């Protein structure tokens, strides 16, 4: 299906091939887990050469959802919030570090259509999760994803809950 180049843990670049079957199985599981459908507006925030971009595009396209493309400029807190509000995004994957900053400056809940946020790329700190769970955005589902490129984007999904 695709080849991505990564240095992984070795620091030496290598091509990682992912088969059509592995990608298809992964996408079916992702869709079943997160329930993306034709009514969703999914935020695309990663560069296309990063495997996470597949989570931000392919599930939405398979279900007839809208993909809200990032554009050439990287996100800052204000532009991320403006895009989420203006485009009525319902599903967003936000890098963990950016999410931690964004939740402190997020727009009021009534302005957001978000139903699901996924974070990943680094550990999800417990204090940041507690702040989310105790704050005004607590009804937006938050899940942590992890996986090296070799495992077809993400190998583990952690659905966060009240006890986390």
Where do the model's predicted regions map?
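Motif- and composition-driven signal specific to adenylation
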Residues: 1-164
